[in-house]
């Protein structure tokens, strides 16, 4: 290729269009200076009170007259100097007032893109994009965009990540979604009331507070101890109810769609092929109703909840969608450790179980809160046999399988000879599974 040919090719490329965030963004960023002052005041409450007592009304008004415009100017300038653009290969974000910073997010490294709307953002009609990128511990985000623009940008980024040409990616639009199920608010509320954490805190309060009153006869002492206990009990139920309200699960070509939230609305996507482990969690008080909770380990993503509560039959059908070709082993198929294992883990050894099928490595643990972990053979990165001195004396061992999401699933307290055979067999199943696995794709 000649130099002139390269120059002509560069000139023929469409110019990169830089865009700004939504105009309400300065209101969000203007809070930064105010937050610094509030943080200082909370950190040194006595010093802040002394400073306030020295201020006259005139001085306070002058200070507010300077602070508010300064904060507004900071918010405006930070918004004005923030741009983003989508190129052929990356999402480019430029920020900074004095020191310019440019973030280059490679499209092929994007694992998932979520659209979230906090309460005030819903009122203003804006949203923010959260991007799960390989190699980062936290999500990158663009905040804020118009709600429609956020969804359009998400669709464009996913289309480009899937390999669509840049000139057609913006025309692809958001992939259609088919609703699979919706968790009724009443079912969610009952399930949260039946979780162990709520009742543990209530039981602690019921026992500790009367004892505290008997010992001190001080109402303030009882309130000081009781309010945090009741607050913890409420937070474990009310907080989760607000976050998991109207949980809706849908299916689309780019993965499973999850919409949820009473105040802060979130729209998340579980990308296909990235699920490393699926867990079916069954608290004690849920068993009579046949409910389970479905959790995930997803490589490159912090999303970990697929279903907050669902009947077991429905949950198993959803698992079959997440892990095609996988059937959840029934409880009777899970083999317990031998009785001699009770010397290693008294009582709780009965909660362990193992089943290995052609598709998954399944391990169970827990008596009061059962958890069944399913790992597809193709997702196993390594296999380890662990045997401590006490286990060696009792002739048992643990077999650990490690996944790509930095997770580990263990088959506890297996007979030593069985564990050695399982170690070799699982390594071979993993190699075969990775060889025969279909490639991970964003879109069909």
What annotation goes with each model-predicted range?
Residues 1-444:
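N-terminal basic, Ser/Thr-rich segments that initiate or prime the first beta/alpha elements at protein or domain
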């Amino acid at each position: 290729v000649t130099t002139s040919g390269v120059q002509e090719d560069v000139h023929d490329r469409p110019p990169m269009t830089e865009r700004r965030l939504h105009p309400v963004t300065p209101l969000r960023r203007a809070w930064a200076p105010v937050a610094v002052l509030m943080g200082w005041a909370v950190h040194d409450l006595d010093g802040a009170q002394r400073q306030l007592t020295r201020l006259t009304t005139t001085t306070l008004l002058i200070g507010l007259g300077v602070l508010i415009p300064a904060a507004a100017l900071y918010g405006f300038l930070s918004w004005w100097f923030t741009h983003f653009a989508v190129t052929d290969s990356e999402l480019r974000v430029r920020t900074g007032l004095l020191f310019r910073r440019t973030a280059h997010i490679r499209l092929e490294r994007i694992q998932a893109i979520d659209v979230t709307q906090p309460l005030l953002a819903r009122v203003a009609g804006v949203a923010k994009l959260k991007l799960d990128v390989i190699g980062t511990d936290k999500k990158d985000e663009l905040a804020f965009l118009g709600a429609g623009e956020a969804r359009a940008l998400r669709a464009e980024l996913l289309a480009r990540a899937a390999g669509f040409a840049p000139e057609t990616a913006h025309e692809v639009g958001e992939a259609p979604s088919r609703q699979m199920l919706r968790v009724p608010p009443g079912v969610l509320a009952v399930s949260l009331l039946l979780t162990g954490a709520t009742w543990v805190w209530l039981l602690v309060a019921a026992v500790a507070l009367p004892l505290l009153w008997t010992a001190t006869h001080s109402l303030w002492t009882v309130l000081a101890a009781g309010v945090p206990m009741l607050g913890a009990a409420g937070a474990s139920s009310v907080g989760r109810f607000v976050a998991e309200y109207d949980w809706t699960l849908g299916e689309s070509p780019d993965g499973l769609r999850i919409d949820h939230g009473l105040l802060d609305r979130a729209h998340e996507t579980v990308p296909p092929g990235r699920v490393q482990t699926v867990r079916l969690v069954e608290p004690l008080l849920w068993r009579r109703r046949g409910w389970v909770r479905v959790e995930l380990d997803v490589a490159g993503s912090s999303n970990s909840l697929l279903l907050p509560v669902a009947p077991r039959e429905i949950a198993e059908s959803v698992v079959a969608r997440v892990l095609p070709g996988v059937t959840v082993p029934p409880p009777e198929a899970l083999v317990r450790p031998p009785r001699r294992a009770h010397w290693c883990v008294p009582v709780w050894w009965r909660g362990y179980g193992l089943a290995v099928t052609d598709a998954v490595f399944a391990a169970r643990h827990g008596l009061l809160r059962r958890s069944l972990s399913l790992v597809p053979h193709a997702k196993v990165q390594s296999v380890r046999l662990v045997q401590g001195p006490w286990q060696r004396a009792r002739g048992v061992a643990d077999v650990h399988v490690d996944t790509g999401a930095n997770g580990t699933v263990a088959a506890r307290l297996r007979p030593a000879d069985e564990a050695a055979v399982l170690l070799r067999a699982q390594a071979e199943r993993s190699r075969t599974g990775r060889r025969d696995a279909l490639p991970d794709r964003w879109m069909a």
